[in-house]
Regions:
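C-terminal transmembrane helical hairpin of 12-TM major facilitator-type secondary transporters
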Residues: 73-121
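A late C-terminal transmembrane helix in Major Facilitator Superfamily
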Residues: 53-57, 130-165
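A membrane-interface helix-boundary motif in multi-pass transporters
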Residues: 37, 73-78, 159-183
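Helix-to-loop junctions at the C-terminal end of transmembrane segments
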Residues: 56-72, 161-162
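Extracytoplasmic gate region of multi-pass secondary transporters
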Residues: 4-57, 114-122, 149-157
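Conserved glycine-rich helix-kink/hinge and helix-boundary motifs of the Major Facilitator Superfamily
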Residues: 9, 42-43, 135-140, 176
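Helical-face signature of the major facilitator-like transporter fold
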Residues: 12, 16, 107-111, 142, ...
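Multi-pass alpha-helical transporter architecture, strongest
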Residues: 88-97, 175-206
């Protein structure tokens, strides 16, 4: 029964890793790579995180509903697929290529796409799950988010910086690397999970 929920559970985990990785390490990235003072980081990145994150969370359901009205099959997964593609491209560009004067633009766009599907994960899992199993699936989702988000998110950036690149100034490479890993993996999971998700919606509605 749970095979239809697995793509959302696992795919969302990789997006959550990016979310907490960015939130934990962007201030350090701006300080080490671009030489920003902590007060500037707090003022400017704080505003970017607030507005980009809020805009992404609000926009996700709006876009999903619009795609549904256009009869797009499994619109929720389509939003997730677009998110994965965008993050795979925009993330590395932001952390490797942008100058100090334009990096916040890249971080804004990245933060927007990271938060775009967040509101859809939990509600979509509920939509395709029979009533008697919703509590179990919700528990699995919360467990997955906590383990991957709070655990792996901040840790994986530190691992690449300290153990792989072995240079604290390589945090830009570490940030780009997690996007190049998590982005394509989440894309593949969502892409191949779209059909089972669509079938689950049909079964639930019938």
């Amino acid at each position: 029964m749970y095979k239809r929920q697995i793509p959302l559970l696992i795919g969302s985990a990789f997006i959550i890793v990016l979310l907490y990785g960015v939130q934990s390490w962007v201030p350090t990235f701006l300080h080490r790579i671009h030489g920003w003072e902590h007060t500037r980081i707090g003022d400017q990145y704080g505003l970017v995180a607030l507005f980009a994150g809020s805009l992404g969370v609000v926009s996700g359901p709006v876009i999903e509903k619009y795609l549904t009205k256009l009869n797009v099959n499994a619109a929720t997964i389509v939003v997730c697929i677009v998110t994965a593609i965008a993050l795979t491209i925009i993330g590395p560009i932001t952390f490797l290529s942008l100058s100090s004067s334009t990096v916040l633009i890249g971080i804004f766009i990245t933060s927007f796409f990271i938060t775009l599907p967040l509101a859809l994960f939990a509600t979509s899992l509920q939509n395709i799950t029979p009533n008697q199993y919703r509590g179990v699936v919700s528990g699995l989702y919360v467990f997955t988010v906590n383990i991957t988000g709070y655990g792996l998110g901040p840790m994986v950036v530190a691992f690449f910086t300290d153990k792989v690149f072995k240079n604290e100034m390589a945090i830009d490479l570490s940030m780009a690397t997690i996007f190049l890993i998590c982005g394509p993996i989440s894309f593949l999971i969502f892409y191949f999970g779209r059909k089972p998700f669509a079938k689950a919606l049909v079964m639930k509605s019938s």
